[in-house]
């Protein structure tokens, strides 16, 4: 089903299911003996969502490499890709903490548990924004686990297509102090004009010294819809009915690095291939890589 301007979802369907895919990847990467990341909450959150495909995958009862067109190398590339992505953004927040930033905003937070697992200073406030049912689900599951946030956590149940800047201010965001922003795994699910509007709003809410991190996928411009459908087919055969070709917004859009620089940010990007190399992992062959191609991870600081 194609996206609409007011579509809704939970963590087992549509865009929401991609948050569960990401959490399952983090759970599997957390077990990797190389120890690149450690997210102890990813697995119980995925189990609570209850999608059998992901649970079997995490438990080793379902080997992705048995799927048509999914080799063992491609399956490993999926897990390794989630490991380097998670570490990049974990390190980003670590650098923000070291610089003295004491408020963070995680946009479209999904099953992100960084408020619970990163070593935040006690006076830090972490804001999380996502659809109401997503916020409620994660909050309740983590409470049932007895998990406690390691910072002051302020969860804001709002669709990012709504007036989230007003909601964020109402929740206590101090726009006179630097903020560390995160938009992880979000941009491909936004129309081009909404991507620009997101960074316009972030800029308007940011004091000098603020930072933002995200990733940009140049391949979204000429996204191979047929290849994405082909890759989704085998998953559908095993009970996971997610068609990525219907969830993302394709077509020309501004490059995030260029757009942020034009807004006064000092922005830099690093390719995922470089992150694989930096972390001592093999760079996947093109045939084993993401159907969107290369991914650029971006961090930026607002000059003042």
From Swiss-Prot:
EC numbers: 2.1.1.-
Example GO biological process: methylation
Family: Belongs to the UPF0677 family.
Pfam assignment, any one: LCM
Top EC category: transferase
Name of the molecule in the record: Putative S-adenosyl-L-methionine-dependent methyltransferase MUL_0816
SUPFAM superfamilies associated with the record: S-adenosyl-L-methionine-dependent methyltransferases (SSF53335)
Gene3D superfamilies according to UniProt: Vaccinia Virus protein VP39
Known role: Exhibits S-adenosyl-L-methionine-dependent methyltransferase activity.
Gene Ontology molecular function: methyltransferase activity
Alphabetized UniProt keyword annotations: Methyltransferase, S-adenosyl-L-methionine, Transferase
């Amino acid at each position: 089903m194609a996206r609409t301007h007011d579509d809704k979802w939970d963590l087992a369907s549509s865009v929401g299911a991609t948050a569960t895919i990401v959490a399952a990847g983090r759970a599997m990467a957390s077990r990797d003996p190389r120890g690149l990341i450690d997210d102890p909450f990813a697995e119980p959150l995925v189990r609570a969502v209850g999608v059998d495909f992901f649970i079997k995958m995490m438990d080793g009862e379902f080997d992705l490499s048995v799927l048509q067109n999914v080799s063992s190398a491609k399956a490993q590339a999926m897990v390794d890709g989630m490991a380097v992505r998670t570490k990049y953004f974990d390190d980003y927040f670590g650098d923000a903490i070291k610089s003295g930033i004491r408020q963070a905003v995680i946009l479209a937070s999904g099953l992100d548990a960084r408020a619970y697992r990163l070593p935040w200073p006690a006076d830090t406030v972490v804001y999380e924004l996502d659809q109401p049912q997503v916020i409620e689900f994660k909050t309740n599951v983590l409470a049932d686990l007895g998990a406690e946030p390691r910072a002051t956590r302020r969860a804001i149940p709002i669709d990012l297509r709504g007036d989230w800047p007003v909601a964020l201010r109402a929740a206590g965001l101090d726009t006179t102090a630097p903020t560390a922003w995160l938009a992880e795994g979000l941009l491909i699910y936004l129309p081009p004009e909404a991507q620009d509007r997101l960074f316009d709003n972030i800029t308007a809410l940011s004091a000098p010294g603020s930072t933002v991190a995200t990733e940009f996928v140049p391949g979204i411009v000429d996204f191979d819809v047929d290849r994405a459908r082909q890759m989704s087919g085998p998953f559908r055969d095993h009970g996971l009915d997610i068609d990525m070709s219907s969830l993302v917004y394709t077509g020309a859009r501004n490059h995030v690095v260029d757009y942020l620089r034009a807004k006064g940010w000092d922005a830099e990007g690093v390719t995922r291939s470089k992150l694989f190399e930096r972390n001592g992992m093999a760079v996947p062959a093109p045939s084993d890589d993401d159907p969107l191609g290369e991914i650029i991870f971006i961090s930026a600081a607002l000059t003042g």
